[in-house]
């Protein structure tokens, strides 16, 4: 019997954390639009995961998840494009730190991106929303 968290619960936690992060950024008065853009990226990723088709074969399953992950990264780069206050550097630092955590089954491992490195073909892990919450928490920690 493993821990089962519903998507709604996880995204509620994410929303609360994002609200806190956005409030902290607004108080600092820096790059408000960037954090709205990042939160929109996370919400879009969450919507895609919530509407994820569960009956796909394994390869198509992973390809679908990786396309969501790629879209998320494109969205974040776009959101960061207008901020001149080091947000891009913070995002790259956050991605490097997240990759270095070496969490088995993480999206960095499952979706190696354009490097051409072969990644394991596993079924969609249920921890994707938890990874999103973790990335949000890590971003908050880096910005403090």
UniProtKB/Swiss-Prot annotation:
Pfam families: NRN1 (PF15056). Its main location: membrane. It comes from Xenopus laevis. This is Neuritin-B. GO terms for cellular component: plasma membrane; side of membrane. GO terms for biological process: neuron projection extension. It is a lipid-anchor; GPI-anchor. Keywords: Cell membrane, Glycoprotein, GPI-anchor, Lipoprotein, Membrane, Signal. Modulates postsynaptic dendritic arbor elaboration and synaptic maturation. The gene is nrn1-b. Residues 1-27 form the signal peptide. Disulfide bonds: none annotated. A lipid is attached at residue 114 (GPI-anchor amidated serine). It is found in: Cell membrane. Residues 115-144 form a propeptide.
């Amino acid at each position: 019997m493993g821990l089962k968290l519903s998507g709604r619960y996880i995204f509620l936690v994410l929303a609360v954390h994002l609200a806190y992060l956005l409030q902290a950024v607004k108080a600092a008065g820096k790059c408000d639009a960037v954090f709205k853009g990042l939160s929109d990226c996370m919400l879009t990723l969450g919507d895609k995961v919530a509407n994820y088709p569960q009956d796909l074969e394994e390869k198509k399953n992973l390809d679908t998840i990786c396309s969501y992950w790629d879209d998320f990264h494109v969205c974040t780069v776009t959101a960061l494009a207008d901020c001149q206050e080091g947000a891009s550097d913070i995002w790259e630092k956050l991605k490097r730190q997240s990759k270095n955590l070496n969490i088995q089954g993480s999206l960095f491992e499952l979706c190696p991106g354009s490097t051409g490195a072969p990644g394991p073909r596993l079924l969609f892990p249920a921890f994707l929303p938890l990874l999103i919450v973790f990335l949000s928490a890590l971003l908050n920690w880096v910005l403090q």
